[in-house]
């Protein structure tokens, strides 16, 4: 097809200014930009200068083709800065490693966003020391690589750092790396028990969001009670903990975050055999530090620990909590009123339950928590119910005792239509303490 001037449409694209061509290529997937290099030397020059680079080894014919292409794009003789570099790859143990050089080249070209992901756990991929002094870096994600020790860190612009299943030479490296990022706001650290770091200290004056995960369960029962987490982050607004190994969680100089997601065990299985009194002190101090939280999500594992804790002393109060998402084991559900009593101003409650058997019993305290009398507006049972006696007793408990309830939502998991009909009839028989309550049934 020709234009009025007799120039082909393909030539019209080639006549575009350099900066516009570069912008067009930057908006294409990197693998598509690579293909344009065969059009001409000019197109090849532009395709190798795009600032957004994403390479996945699965899109190439093996690791060495992947490595050859990445080499070409990360040539340090090019003057263009790299806005983002993302590498996702795996290699066999005998394959030559180029990762250290690739990252070093990206640092030289003033990379701002770096994302390195390895799928294989064979061998170690070492990052270069130059990464520790990359003054242009804004976000960093490292997965399954090895971090060397350092003498100096300067990451003045780094705001987001995700460190997933990496290898560290000692506890101090990770602590110093985190504390050496003066504007860090978002931190995600995932470890397993082979990562060496047993005592994780997070110290940051700028941190707003913190996600910590430690998976010890996949390695079986690790007979070691020296695992510990210490958090000193006064500006923290979101905290997520997933940890089945650490015995102690210390929140030092932390103003209670607005939102927390807690799935921890406090190593309570071994503590029962050793010193549960000490664990009670750790649990008490931890949740007292969270007393100002507004939005809490809690796992069934943590709730089970708290149920055991409440045999000896009451929970701390959470006067500011307005939203609570809780996963309850059926055996702990009788403690629900006690939990709610600790949340006097709660407005929204979502419950995730185990499946009840038809004749399972549920005994709930006759005392009515303050939040049911004055503040609770929304309740949802997230797990589908089938009409078991214990399930219906729980539904009845909320409908008959919640004075300001606006909406009660439940899901049905019945196998037959007649079972659903029985549940609907029973719901209609329940007295509602709140005249304005809407019952929503999802089938």
UniProtKB/Swiss-Prot annotation:
> Can you give the residue ranges of the FBD domain?
361-412
Report the InterPro entries cross-referenced here: F-box-like_dom_sf (IPR036047), F-box_AtFBL13-like (IPR053781), F-box_dom (IPR001810), FBD (IPR006566), FBL13/AtMIF1-like (IPR050232), LRR_dom_sf (IPR032675), LRR_FXL15/At3g58940/PEG3-like (IPR055411)
LRR repeat spans: 139-165, 166-191, 219-243, 275-300, 325-353
- Give the record's keywords alphabetically: Leucine-rich repeat, Repeat
Xref: SUPFAM superfamilies? F-box domain, RNI-like
Record bears the keyword Lyase: no
Q: Which Pfam families match?
A: F-box, FBD, LRR_At5g56370
Which intervals hold domain F-box? 10-56
Q: Which PANTHER family match?
A: F-BOX/RNI SUPERFAMILY PROTEIN-RELATED, PROTEIN WITH RNI-LIKE_FBD-LIKE DOMAIN
Name of the molecule in the record:
Putative F-box/FBD/LRR-repeat protein At5g22670
């Amino acid at each position: 097809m020709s234009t009025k001037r007799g120039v082909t449409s393909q030539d019209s694209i080639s006549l575009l200014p350099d900066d516009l061509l570069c912008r067009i290529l930057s908006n294409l997937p990197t693998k598509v930009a690579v293909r344009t290099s065969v059009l001409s030397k000019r197109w090849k020059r532009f395709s190798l200068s795009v600032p957004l680079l994403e390479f996945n080894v699965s899109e190439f014919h093996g690791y060495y083709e992947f490595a050859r292409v990445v080499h070409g794009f990360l040539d340090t003789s090019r003057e263009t800065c790299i806005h983002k570099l993302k590498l996702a790859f795996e290699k066999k143990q005998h394959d030559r490693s180029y990762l250290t050089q690739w990252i070093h080249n990206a640092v030289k070209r003033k990379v701002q966003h770096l994302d390195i992901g390895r799928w294989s756990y064979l061998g170690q991929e070492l990052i270069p020391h130059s990464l520790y002094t990359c003054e242009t870096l804004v976000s960093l994600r490292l997965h399954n690589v090895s971090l060397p020790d350092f003498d100096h860190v300067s990451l003045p612009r780094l705001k987001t750092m995700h460190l997933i299943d990496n290898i560290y030479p000692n506890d101090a490296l990770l602590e110093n790396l985190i504390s050496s990022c003066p504007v860090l706001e978002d931190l995600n650290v995932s470890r397993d028990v082979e990562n060496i770091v047993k005592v994780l200290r997070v110290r940051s004056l700028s941190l707003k969001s913190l996600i910590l995960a430690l998976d010890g369960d996949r390695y079986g029962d690790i007979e070691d009670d020296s695992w510990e987490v210490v958090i000193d982050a006064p500006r923290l607004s979101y905290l997520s903990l997933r940890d089945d190994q650490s015995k102690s969680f210390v929140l030092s100089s932390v103003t209670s975050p607005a939102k927390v997601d807690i799935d921890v065990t406090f190593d309570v299985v071994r503590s029962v055999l050793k010193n549960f009194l000490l664990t009670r002190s750790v649990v008490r101090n931890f949740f007292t530090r969270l007393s100002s939280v507004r939005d809490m999500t809690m796992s069934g594992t943590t709730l089970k620990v708290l149920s055991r804790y409440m045999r000896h002393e009451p929970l701390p109060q959470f006067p500011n909590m307005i939203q609570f998402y809780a996963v309850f084991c059926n055996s702990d559900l009788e403690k629900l009123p006690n939990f709610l009593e600790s949340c006097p101003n709660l407005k929204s409650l979502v419950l995730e339950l185990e499946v009840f058997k038809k004749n399972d019993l549920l005994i709930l305290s006759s005392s009515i928590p303050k939040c049911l009398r004055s503040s609770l507006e929304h309740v949802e049972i997230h797990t589908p119910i089938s009409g078991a006696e214990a399930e219906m007793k729980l539904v009845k408990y909320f409908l008959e005792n919640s004075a300001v309830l606006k909406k009660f939502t439940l899901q049905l998991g019945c196998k037959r239509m007649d079972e659903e009909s029985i549940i609907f009839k029973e719901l209609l028989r329940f007295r509602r303490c709140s005249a304005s309550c809407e019952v929503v049934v999802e089938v």
